[in-house]
Structure formats: structure tokens, C-alpha cells
């Protein structure tokens, strides 16, 4: 996979791209990353990348020329996805991460200032993505978050493929509780089932915990999750137990 970042602050990416999973993916030649400072593609002697909005208003708007020129400098493929980081976009989800991980090439356009000239959005972008209902100073941090979420899904990047298959949201549910040594700590014990050695019982317990944890912490996810009769029974038993308690 190749990922390009169009940004005014390429140095922001240095630490993130050279640590942990992202560095491992590059070392394995599974990922190529490139930062493009689109200020270098401005068309006036002052390297101006923004200007006042037509019609008046607050803030500055990113000019089209630097970003169009920067995009033309990038070698693209037939399935290149051009991501515009903006509050108006679709909320980023694990499903989107899964989809983008299938692409050979992803370009992130990371803006600053008040916004983008609309022609950038209309003629260059394939996807508009938001990290949530809040506003950040620029698109660099969201692009880094998305890159981490996407790259860890590439086959062979993680040491254990099962690691991301068990992640929260991968199947529409939150992850089950995890425990490690010691068996007891300050009066708190690990559930006996995890020490039983019975993998069928352990799998059943973990799945029940995923259902219950999602019901308690993110019930909105269950509205989209196709629950079986057995899974609905798990929730109903939990509700009855709460009433008794």
C-alpha cells in the first residue's frame, strides 16, 4: 500500500510514521508513505496557499491551485482513494478502515484555516471523512489516526492476524474483557472460566461478554447488529438480573 499526505506541516508526521506498527509495515515493504508540502506548489512568489473567501466571511480558504498541482505530481492508480479530512464528511468507522485497507493507494488531503475551495472537493476527492462532531485545527491528526487504523489491517503487519479480528467494532461489537497475570490482585480475581482450559466455554463466555459490554456501553451498536435469538436471550437475562439486584 502507498499513502500520500498533502499537508502544510509534513514534520508533524515524522514521529507517528517512524514508530510501532507503521514503521514495522514500512520495514516489511508493505507500506510506502510520502508527505507532500503543497505550499511548494503555490503559483505566486509568496507561496500563498490561502486567500479571503468570496462573499466575505471569517477566516481564510485554501486556494485550489496548490492542491491541484500537488495532486498532479502524485502517481496514482486506478483505485486511488483521495480522502478529504473535514467535519462535513462521513464519520470514520471500522468498516471504512476495512474498506480502505483493500486499496493500493490512499491520498489524504490535510487542510488548515477556515476550509477548502469547493472546487477541490468537487473535482479531486473520492471520499470526505470526519473523525466526529468536533473541529480540529487541521487534517493532519485525523489522517494519522486513519492511517494507523487502516495499516494494522494489512495482512502480515500485526504479529498475530487474530489480534485485529478480535478488536472492538471488527464484527460490530465491543471487545470482550482481557486479563493477564497475576490471577488475583488486591482481592480481584480472574474469572474461573478463563482458567478452565475449556476453549468452547471460554469462547462462549467471551461472546456473551461482547454482547453485554456492547449493550451497556454502546447500545447504539446493537441497533445495527443482527442479533440471534440466543444473543437476545443473553441481554434479557442480564436485564432480569439487574432488576433482582
Curated annotation (Swiss-Prot):
* Annotated positions binding S-adenosyl-L-methionine: 111, 131-136
| Keywords for this protein | Cytoplasm, Methyltransferase, S-adenosyl-L-methionine, Transferase, tRNA processing
* Enzyme class, broadest EC rank: transferase
Query: An example of a Gene Ontology BP annotation on this entry?
Result: tRNA N1-guanine methylation
* Keyword check for Transferase: yes
The Enzyme Commission number assigned here is: 2.1.1.228
Which GO terms fall under molecular function for this chain's record? tRNA (guanine(37)-N1)-methyltransferase activity
Q: Where in the cell is it found?
A: Cytoplasm
- Catalyzed reactions: guanosine(37) in tRNA + S-adenosyl-L-methionine = N(1)-methylguanosine(37) in tRNA + S-adenosyl-L-homocysteine + H(+)
Q: How does it assemble?
A: Homodimer.
Q: Which family does it belong to?
A: Belongs to the RNA methyltransferase TrmD family.
What function is annotated for this protein? Specifically methylates guanosine-37 in various tRNAs.
Name of this chain's protein: tRNA (guanine-N(1)-)-methyltransferase
Amino acid at each position: 500500500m502507498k499513502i500520500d499526505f498533502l499537508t502544510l506541516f509534513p514534520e508533524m508526521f515524522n514521529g507517528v510514521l517512524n514508530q510501532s506498527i507503521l514503521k514495522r509495515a514500512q520495514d516489511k515493504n508493505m507500506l510506502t508513505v510520502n508527505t507532500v508540502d503543497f505550499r511548494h506548489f503555490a503559483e505566486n512568489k509568496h507561496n500563498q496557499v490561502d486567500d479571503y473567501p468570496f462573499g466575505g466571511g471569517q477566516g481564510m480558504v485554501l486556494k485550489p491551485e496548490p492542491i491541484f498541482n500537488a495532486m498532479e505530481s502524485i502517481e496514482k492508480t486506478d483505485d486511488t482513494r483521495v480522502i478529504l479530512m473535514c467535519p462535513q464528511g462521513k464519520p470514520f468507522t471500522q468498516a471504512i478502515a476495512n474498506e480502505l485497507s483493500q486499496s493500493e493507494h490512499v491520498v489524504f488531503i490535510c487542510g488548515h484555516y477556515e476550509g477548502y475551495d469547493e472546487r477541490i472537493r468537487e473535482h479531486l476527492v473520492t471520499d470526505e471523512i470526519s473523525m466526529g462532531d468536533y473541529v480540529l485545527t487541521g487534517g493532519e491528526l485525523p489522517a494519522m489516526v486513519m492511517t494507523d487504523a487502516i495499516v494494522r489491517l494489512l495482512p502480515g503487519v500485526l504479529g498475530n492476524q487474530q489480534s485485529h479480528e478480535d478488536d472492538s467494532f471488527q464484527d460490530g461489537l465491543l471487545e470482550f474483557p482481557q486479563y493477564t497475570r497475576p490471577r488475583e490482585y488486591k482481592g480481584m480475581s480472574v474469572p474461573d472460566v478463563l482458567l478452565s482450559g475449556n476453549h468452547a466455554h471460554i469462547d462462549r463466555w467471551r461472546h456473551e461478554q461482547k454482547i453485554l459490554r456492547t449493550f451497556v456501553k454502546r447500545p447504539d451498536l446493537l441497533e445495527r447488529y443482527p442479533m440471534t435469538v440466543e444473543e437476545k436471550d443473553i441481554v434479557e437475562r442480564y436485564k432480569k438480573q439487574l432488576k433482582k439486584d
